[in-house]
């Protein structure tokens, strides 16, 4: 079998359906530091820049949010997505998130696209789980978990 005629460069974008766009914008823009790149209110679409990727926020009452695609049995099919952060200073990040009322869940060392590094999970206002991850060497390494 030969190699495919392409190479995956990374995640281009993810699309999240949100109940309240203003609340989602506060979270992704103000808490996580993403910038608004493009808005198409007629579609219920706001696109946020997250490093080299985009996070598309789609309102449930807009044309895109009402699309016929539905989750499989038992609920949504997305477990979580991961945002790589630099620098990853765990205490500073935890304090920043706590100031916004965001709970840090299950801090540990995990493997990702750039190798092992410290990470933890948070949830956005719509319950989407997000992993925030540092590169190897950022933060403590105890509690190794893959």
Predicted feature locations:
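Helix-adjacent hinge/juxtasegments
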Residues: 60, 66-84
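N-terminal beta-strand motif that seeds the catalytic metal site of vicinal oxygen chelate
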Residues: 1-22, 78-81, 85, 136-146
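Vicinal oxygen chelate
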Residues: 18-22, 76-77, 81-126
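Residue-level marker for the onset of beta-strands and adjacent loop->beta junctions
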Residues: 12, 43-44, 79, 118
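A short acidic/small-residue loop/turn micro-motif
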Residues: 63, 112, 136-139
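Core segments of cupin and vicinal oxygen chelate
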Residues: 16-62
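Active-site beta-strand termini and strand-to-loop segments that position acidic
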Residues: 48-52, 122-125, 135
């Amino acid at each position: 079998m030969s190699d495919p005629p392409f190479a995956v460069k990374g995640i281009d974008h993810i699309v999240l359906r949100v109940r309240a766009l203003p609340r989602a914008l506060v979270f992704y823009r103000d808490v996580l530091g993403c910038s608004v790149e493009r808005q198409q209110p007629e579609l219920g679409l706001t696109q946020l820049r997250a490093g080299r990727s985009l996070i598309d926020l789609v309102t449930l009452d807009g044309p895109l949010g009402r699309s016929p695609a539905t989750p499989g049995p038992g609920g949504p099919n997305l477990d979580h997505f991961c945002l790589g952060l630099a620098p990853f200073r765990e205490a500073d990040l935890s304090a920043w998130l706590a100031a916004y009322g965001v709970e840090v869940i299950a801090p540990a060392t995990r493997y990702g696209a750039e190798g092992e590094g410290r990470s933890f999970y948070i949830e956005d206002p719509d319950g989407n789980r997000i992993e925030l991850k540092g590169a190897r060497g950022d933060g403590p390494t105890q509690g190794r978990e893959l």
